[in-house]
A protein has these predicted regions:
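Glycine-rich portal/gate segments that line the openings of hydrophobic small-molecule binding cavities
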Residues: 148-221
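C-terminal region of N-terminal signal peptides and the immediate post-cleavage residues
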Residues: 24-36
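Amphipathic alpha-helical segments
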Residues: 122-141
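Terminal "cap-and-tail" regions of soluble proteins that handle hydrophobic small molecules
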Residues: 36-109, 231-306
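Terminal, regulation- and interaction-focused segments at domain boundaries
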Residues: 107-128
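A short, structured loop/turn motif at beta-sheet edges
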Residues: 123, 200-205, 229-238
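Short, surface-exposed coil-to-beta transition loops
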Residues: 114-116, 221-227
Length: 306
């Protein structure tokens, strides 16, 4: 508890610096602006969104989560003794094999909030997910395809969608800024994608691992790690997702992005950044819903816009 209070005070100082920078830079959009105005978050799809070439994939609601996710969400947390430590993540997401618990939530022995979700995806390949992560963050409407109920806003540090690059290089080394509901709480997140091979993952041909640091769009603070491993199975692929939260570290402030985030309106206070079991449980459901929803039409989206 004392450590959490110390971290909360440290985040407060970081937040103050970020917000001060936001005021100085003046890059703040109106939180209640029209949906198609720059730097605006909004629910659902705007009339302009409906004119985009991928509009036929826009659903009014997110598809339900798979049954194993529903069962885990309704059940108790996984005991700490059964949760791999973050240091074992590379072994947990090995190129072959499986883990005793592939879908669940809980807290590690060292206090990290942990989430695991396995999603079976007929007709989907790892290459489709590498393409998706390089394609979706440049427009909020694309991001909303993933979870139309909860996703409100997306932007990318460097738009590489038109660059002559392999799909993985469009997002690795890049930062995605998103506003989304995870459970009842509106989060403003900065997700910095990193090279999985450089971080010790085995990524054979036909597989991928999407690996990144999860941080705040407002405060210069990272709060955890995420990894999505995609492996082929008969008829499609499986995604094995892992989240470890309450892994705090400071990062270089981005005052312009902080100003933009503040300008989009209120969200979860970065001073209350610690993830409890309820937050982990909500993230389990959110991940299960969005991965299952997008997988239903990702092959068609990929063939049309790759």
């Amino acid at each position: 508890v004392a450590r959490q209070r110390y971290l909360t005070r440290r985040v407060t100082l970081s937040l103050g610096a970020a917000v001060a920078g936001a005021v100085v830079t003046g890059g703040v959009g109106a939180a209640n602006a029209e949906p198609d105005a720059p730097n605006t978050r909004y629910r659902g799809y705007s009339d302009h969104d409906r004119t985009r070439p991928y509009a036929k994939y826009m659903a009014d609601r997110t598809a339900p989560e798979p049954a194993p996710v529903s069962a885990a969400y309704a059940g108790p947390p996984t005991p700490a003794a059964d949760i791999p430590d973050f240091s074992a993540l590379r072994a947990d997401l090995a190129a072959t094999g499986s883990s005793p618990i592939e879908t669940g939530y809980g807290r590690t022995a060292s206090g990290q909030a942990w989430v695991a979700v396995r999603t079976e995806m007929p007709r989907v390949t790892a290459a489709m997910w590498d393409w998706w992560f390089g394609w979706h963050s440049s427009e909020s409407a694309r991001y909303k395809l993933w979870h139309p109920d909860a996703h409100l806003y997306a932007a990318i540090a460097a738009d590489r969608t038109a660059a002559p690059l392999p799909d993985r290089e469009r997002y690795v080394g890049n930062i995605s800024y998103v506003d989304e509901y995870i459970g009842p709480k509106l989060q403003q997140l900065a997700i910095a994608f990193q090279d999985p091979i450089a971080h010790g993952f085995d990524v054979p041909e036909g597989q991928t691992v999407v690996f990144g640091r999860v941080g705040s769009s407002v405060a210069p603070l990272d709060v955890g790690r995420l990894a999505h491993q995609v492996r082929p199975i008969p008829g499609g692929c499986e995604m094995r997702s892992r989240f470890y939260l309450n892994m705090w570290s400071l990062r270089v402030p981005d005052l312009a992005r902080a100003a933009d985030a503040v300008g989009r309106g209120p969200s979860v206070d970065p001073r209350d950044i610690a993830a409890d079991l309820d937050a982990a449980r909500d993230l389990l459901l959110h991940c299960g819903q969005e991965m299952n929803h997008l997988a239903r039409f990702l092959p068609e989206l990929y063939r049309e816009f790759r």
